[in-house]
Amino acid sequence: MTSKTVTRADLASVVCRKVGLSHTESAALVELVLNEICNSLVRGEAVKLSSFATFQVRKKNERVGRNPKTGVEAPILPRRVVTFKAANVLKQRILDSHRARQKIISHE
């Protein structure tokens, strides 16, 4: 498994190469898409990208937490968190890739 992290710049480079936009235009397009996803989530809307994933904002209620070092209880305030649920198509693609890699390793 690789430890590479894909960045905004990496995405912009792929758009530049595959779509034919300039690097500046590609970076602006990536930024526009990410901003729209963020804005939708801020408004409380779910973002569903077919065959990829669904992002949703979930409300978490107040609860009591505990400091793991001291054991002292402390309230955890209510908040909103973003959840990511991978689509079955993405899950299967990752599983297939993992199985193919395992098959190659076992035949070496």
UniProtKB/Swiss-Prot annotation:
SMART domains: BHL. The keyword DNA-binding applies. One of its GO terms (cellular component) is cytosol. Belongs to the bacterial histone-like protein family. This protein is one of the two subunits of integration host factor, a specific DNA-binding protein that functions in genetic recombination as well as in transcriptional and translational control. Keywords: DNA recombination, DNA-binding, Transcription, Transcription regulation, Translation regulation. This is Integration host factor subunit alpha. Signal peptide: none annotated. Heterodimer of an alpha and a beta chain. GO terms for molecular function: DNA binding; structural constituent of chromatin. One of its GO terms (biological process) is regulation of DNA-templated transcription. It comes from the Bacteria. The keyword Cytoplasm does not apply. Pfam families: Bac_DNA_binding. SUPFAM superfamilies: IHF-like DNA-binding proteins.
